Amino acid sequence: MTDARNVAAWRTPQGTTVPGNRWDLLDGVDAAAVSVSVVVPYYRQQNQLSMVLAALERQDFPRDRLEVIVADDGSPEPPQVECGIPVTVVTQEDRGFRAAAARNLGAAAATGDVLCFLDADTVPEPGYVRALVRLPSLIPDALTVGRRRHADLTALGRLPEPGDPLLDEPGWLLDAYERSRDLLDADDRSYRHVISAVMCCRRTFFDEVGGFDESFTSYGGEDWELANRAWLAGAVLAHVPTAVAWHDGPDWAGRPDDRRRDAKNGEAMALAPLVTDPAARRHGVRYAVPDVTAVVHSEGHTAASLMVTVGSILRHGDVTVWVDGAEASSFVGTWGIDDPRVRVGSPTAADTARSRFAVEVGGRAVFGETAFELLAG
């Protein structure tokens, strides 16, 4: 384990950089002065939106550095947005559930340095924005997630007070935050603990990773996919338990079994082609995006030795091997194979962006049976 005394944060023109996921090195450091855009995806939720806007008016964050973008997913009537904070409404055509596209539309209209995503049915406590934006204000690649609690806000008509009935928080998520020390000990599976309903990052980092994937057109999954892509791009993940917002109604675990099962099955199907985590790919089928992208240089090989090297990589499962070099095509052509995992040429950045691991191989290497398991840690 790294000794904390031997690591430190350091300043760059873009902000503070920390080694690994060590956001704890900035404990006690005040936020930088940034402007914040709260992006609220919305569809026919006027009463809930009104509660959200009223709660945003009560934030202890400076109003002159705060704006709200309501991203309407094609509601029949436009939302009413009476608020003491500047509010912009952007609208897209109603083509079904497109929360990912709505969030991107809202982000595109935002002018703030930091994007704070907040669902229209999730009402923040007064310190929410201040707490959630602190790390992104300091670390340019921070991705923070707040604490989403649950209550029947429609019945209460306000945020809960002591003695009010509450709904359960998802135990699996609370356990994950406890085990990981609020994601300080994040790993390749921590994307599952980032929720777009209470999520925050720098505008520049959001643009760098490409925003939400708009192929998601049903409930759930787009936040996990974005968090996975951000992690692969070097994001610093942090759960901020003091950034509390209240969801109006139960978590999915508290909803009818059939609805929950159908939604989770659809989410899993949408994630598997894009997230290469083996736990997200349990059905034995192969996807276009591999977990490992390997580049093997043909220089110094014969056709036979090249095949031995490539074959030793392919035995490791979810792998695509690119063979490059002047003789790559002729060598591979002699093998007589019909294997879509083997390609001739060099991968583009887009080809490798979603893979967890990239391997470059020169010379006549032969990989043992456990080599890639060791690589994956």
Regions found by a protein language model. Give the residues of each.
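Short, flexible, basic/aromatic active-site loop/helix in glycosyltransferases
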Residues: 163-191
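Conserved donor NDP-sugar-binding/catalytic core segment of glycosyltransferases
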Residues: 127-169, 365-377
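Acidic donor-binding segment of Leloir-type glycosyltransferases
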Residues: 55-93, 314-343
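Glycine-rich, basic loop-to-helix element that forms the pyrophosphate-binding segment
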Residues: 92-110, 343-350
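Conserved nucleotide-sugar donor-binding
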Residues: 111-112, 195-209, 354-355
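Short aromatic/hydrophobic "clamp" motif used to bind/position activated sugar donors
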Residues: 115, 358
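Acidic donor-binding loop at a coil-to-helix junction in glycosyltransferase catalytic cores
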Residues: 219-225
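N-proximal low-complexity "stem/linker" segments adjacent to membrane-targeting elements
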Residues: 1-55, 270-304
